[in-house]
Amino acid sequence: MKQLLDFLPLVIFFAVYKFYDIYAATGVLIAATAIQLVITYLIYKHIEKMHLATFAMVTVFGSLTLFFHDDAFIKWKVSIVYALFAIGLIASQIMGKSALKSMLGKEMKVDDRIWAQVTWYWVGFFVLCSFANIYIAFNLPLETWVNFKVFGLTALTLINTVITVVYLYKNMQDDNSQPTDNQ
């Protein structure tokens, strides 16, 4: 349910873009993301920081897109969000606290070395997605960018999530093993 709720603004953005234009889709994206936060809070009584950050980025860059009637702002938002995810993972790794371990460590007991590998894998993924978005957004037609944003990046993220889970599962410790450094 939560994952479906996460994708709802993106699906609505795509549908509105197909029937209207990028500006209508951007306005609806801002509204849908706000509604998503409200629904998430009503159901789970909690809103994750990532959702708040995403809402802030959508609101700022979406508003700039609408105010200046320039789709470059909403295109940049995608790359900036991915770059911020990469920076956040790097910062957490440097501080010795894996953000991914914090999110998944209770379900998946693996060595800290594995968490570090997975973190750097995702840093690379986010950086590549950020640059791919810039290239596609500013060198290919708008419709290609919208399709890439909605389907390409979503598919790539799902594929990388599966790869990560398989890798973590393959490296899981049994319950009788010694705890890792930060457990």
Swiss-Prot record:
Keywords: Cell inner membrane, Cell membrane, Membrane, Transmembrane, Transmembrane helix. The keyword Membrane applies. It is a multi-pass membrane protein. GO terms for cellular component: plasma membrane. It comes from the Bacteria. The keyword Cell membrane applies. It holds the Pfam family IspA. This is Inner membrane-spanning protein YciB. It comes from Shewanella frigidimarina (strain NCIMB 400). The lineage of its organism: Bacteria, Pseudomonadati, Pseudomonadota, Gammaproteobacteria, Alteromonadales.
